[in-house]
């Protein structure tokens, strides 16, 4: 079973990009420059009066720097390598109708050539203030969960992803978490390698795996009924994303270490009846302001940030480590 799931891990890492929101990771391939076609010079007019040069359409080939897709590339990786968001790269390449379908050999515009601004004015232009630098990073953390003690043949593989924007001080500007959870029942008959029916795998090879992330599942994920907060998975994750804005990754790590229990959950100050004796001993050391903060936090979210289900803190650290400036 472990060998089979090892294969699943390899497949799933390729498809885990479905969990990625609007930012991207770092690629190591290089780009090539394609020059725009030079317009032909207009014919000399017969008349002695000056004549306007004819208009030449060069819109079919956009001037700028192009990247040539190689096997294994993803659109978000190409965007990240060149300091772009997925949306920005898509706007540069309107000919690409589906960013999830790119092919080896395809050329993608990654930097448009800036037209020289002609000016006859002798006045001095105002100098615009320097733009604040932003950095983007993407992180993944995969973990295999042995669930045998709870349910036979129901182990699972979880791939946690995070896309983040950081300012030049390292503070989080935007943050999006998600998880792809891969269960055995997504592979009918996978426990029997000799099974005659291999149609699932054949279809997958032709059409891909139609997996949904936890956010894509939305309310169908079904956490709301059992959550002490009465909130669905995506609602709680949205809360964490907003709460961590303005903090550095180091500050998030410190917050997690101090205010979360052994299961990676914030101490449930909003639900004191849920606190264990160990929890009560710990929160007794907090100030009133800290206790109030935890009431506010656990009103919005109580699910774990780091446990066998998912590794949000690990993924966030990786995103920061590979951050690249957005240009």
From Swiss-Prot:
By its UniProt entry, which InterPro entries does this protein fall under? LysM_dom, LysM_dom_sf
Explain what switches its activity on or off, per the activity regulation comment. Inhibited by sulfide and to a lesser extent by nitrite.
- Location within or outside the cell: Secreted; Secreted, Cell wall; Cell membrane
Q: Name one GO cellular component term.
A: extracellular region
Q: Which UniProt keywords apply?
A: Aromatic hydrocarbons catabolism, Cell membrane, Cell wall, Cobalamin, Cobalt, Membrane, Secreted, Signal
Which Pfam families does the record associate with it? Answer: LysM
Write the lineage as a comma-separated list. Answer: Bacteria, Bacillati, Bacillota, Clostridia, Eubacteriales
List the Gene Ontology MF annotations in alphabetical order: cobalamin binding; ortho-trichlorophenol reductive dehalogenase activity
Record the organism: Desulfitobacterium hafniense (Desulfitobacterium frappieri)
* Entry protein name: Chlorophenol reductase
Question: What biological processes does GO assign it?
Answer: anaerobic phenol-containing compound catabolic process
Q: Tell me, in a sentence or two, what this protein's role is.
A: Reductive dechlorination of ortho-chlorophenols. Dechlorinates in the ortho position with respect to the hydroxyl group.
* SUPFAM superfamilies per UniProt: LysM domain
According to its record, what is known about the domains? LysM domains are thought to be involved in peptidoglycan binding.
What's the superkingdom here? Bacteria
Induction pattern = By 2,4,6-trichlorophenol.
Tell me which PROSITE patterns the record gives.
LYSM
């Amino acid at each position: 079973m472990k060998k089979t799931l090892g294969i699943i891990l390899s497949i799933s890492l390729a498809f885990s990009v479905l969990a990625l929101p609007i930012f991207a990771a770092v690629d190591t391939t290089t780009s090539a420059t394609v020059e725009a076609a030079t317009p032909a010079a207009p014919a000399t007019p017969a008349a002695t009066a000056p004549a306007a040069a004819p208009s030449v359409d060069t819109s079919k080939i956009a001037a700028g720097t192009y990247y040539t897709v190689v096997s294994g590339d993803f659109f978000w990786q190409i965007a990240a390598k060149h300091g772009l968001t997925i949306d920005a790269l898509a706007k540069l390449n309107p000919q690409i109708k589906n960013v999830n379908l790119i092919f080896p050999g395809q050329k993608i515009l990654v930097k448009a050539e800036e037209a020289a601004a002609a000016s006859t004015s002798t006045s001095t232009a105002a100098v615009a203030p320097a733009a604040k630098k932003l950095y983007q990073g993407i992180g993944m953390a995969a973990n295999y969960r042995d669930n045998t003690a709870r349910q036979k043949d129901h182990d699972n593989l979880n791939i946690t992803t995070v896309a983040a924007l950081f300012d030049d001080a390292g503070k989080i500007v935007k943050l999006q978490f998600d998880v792809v959870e891969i269960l055995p029942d997504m592979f009918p008959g996978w426990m029997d390698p000799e099974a005659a029916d291999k149609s699932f795998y054949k279809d997958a090879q032709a059409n891909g795996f139609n997996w949904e992330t936890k956010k894509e599942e939305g309310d169908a994920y079904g956490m709301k009924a059992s959550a002490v907060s009465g909130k669905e998975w995506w609602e709680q994750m949205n809360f964490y994303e907003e709460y961590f804005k303005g903090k550095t990754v180091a500050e998030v790590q410190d917050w997690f270490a101090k205010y979360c229990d052994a299961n990676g959950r914030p101490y449930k100050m909003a639900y004191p009846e849920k606190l264990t004796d160990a929890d009560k001993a710990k929160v007794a050391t907090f100030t009133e302001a800290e206790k109030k903060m935890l009431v506010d936090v656990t009103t919005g979210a109580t699910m774990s940030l780091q446990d066998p289900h998912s590794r949000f803190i690990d993924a966030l650290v990786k995103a920061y480590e590979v951050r690249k400036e957005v240009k």
